Amino acid sequence: MATDKEYLEYVKDQLSEAEGVSFRPMMGEYIMYTGGKVAGGIYDNRLLVKPTASAKALMPDAPYELPYEGAKEMLLVDNLDDRQFLRELLTAMYEELPEKKKK
């Protein structure tokens, strides 16, 4: 099941206070970048982020979910109504995310 455009727009709006966040469509879903680094994505109308140490610390009870068959597990972000939390989450994760791979 692909992500609805309405859900994408809702998540974008909720993340509007976080700097450097962008999305790129990929096979009906959306990869989320923060400062040019892959932080997670929107899969089947769910916001999932990489399980960095800071993400696990800020969301200790967040369930791990698969974005798609064969992928690595990611953390489900279910606190989408709190814009400040979302900004803090992505800011905290940034330094732990791997640099963009050179081609």
Tell me the role of every PLM-derived stretch:
Residues 1-103:
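Charge-dense, helix-prone N-terminal extensions
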